[in-house]
Curated annotation (Swiss-Prot):
Lineage, broadest ranks: Bacteria, Pseudomonadati, Pseudomonadota, Betaproteobacteria, Burkholderiales
Organism: Leptothrix cholodnii (strain ATCC 51168 / LMG 8142 / SP-6)
HAMAP family hit by this protein: HslV
Function, as annotated: Protease subunit of a proteasome-like degradation complex believed to be a general protein degrading machinery.
Name this polypeptide is given: ATP-dependent protease subunit HslV
Gene field: hslV
Subunit description: A double ring-shaped homohexamer of HslV is capped on each side by a ring-shaped HslU homohexamer. The assembly of the HslU/HslV complex is dependent on binding of ATP.
Alphabetically ordered keywords of this record: Allosteric enzyme, Cytoplasm, Hydrolase, Metal-binding, Protease, Sodium, Threonine protease
Length: 178
């Protein structure tokens, strides 16, 4: 059986501002089954942004686990991410999940990989999913050569990724923290 997959999630940080956005397309094999999915959410008292790429059911499992770790560690993003990956590596069920998370708060942006790794990317840009490389390239250029806000950079970068990646559409959800 084929799994649900394909998306673009992008987070851009500039100074005290961070924005995260994602497209809304969900595919099953080569068929679009939903065009307006919400893959970026606010967690822990609206203070953390999180987006997912990968198998939808697996991503929701990770969201729930990550949110419980945030509660346990009073919103401390890095500690919650490390705790989640520790569980991920030791739990047989979690190890089989096929999803990635992009998470950000006012001070840090992280990628939590399907291998149970926590990565802090360079340039204040997090990009995951099938269109992630396109969105990341666009965002990096705009971040370096314009004064646009993170939300504007995310919006335009997702549009570019949607033009190039068949698993990414033009229906976007964008959240910001200031």
């Amino acid at each position: 059986m084929e799994s649900f997959h394909g998306t673009t999630i992008l987070s851009v940080r500039r100074g005290e501002q961070v924005a995260m956005g994602g497209d809304g397309q969900v595919t099953l094999g080569h068929i679009v089954v939903k065009a307006s999915a919400r893959k970026v959410r606010r967690l822990y008292r609206e203070q953390v942004l999180a987006g997912f790429a990968g198998a939808t059911a697996d991503a929701f499992t990770l969201f729930e686990r990550f949110e419980s770790k945030l509660e346990k560690h009073q919103g401390h993003l890095v500690r919650a991410a490390v705790e989640l990956t520790r569980d991920w590596r030791t739990d047989r069920v979690l190890r089989r999940l096929e999803a990635m998370l992009a998470v950000a708060d006012r001070s840090a942006s992280l990628i939590i990989t399907g291998n149970g790794d926590v990565l802090e990317p360079e340039y204040g840009i997090v990009a995951i999913g099938s269109g992630g490389a396109y969105a990341q390239a666009a965002a990096r250029a705009m971040l370096q050569h314009t004064e646009q806000s993170p939300a504007d950079i995310v919006k335009r970068s997702l549009e570019i990724a949607g033009d190039l990646c068949i698993y990414t559409n033009q229906s976007h959800t964008i959240e910001t923290l200031e």
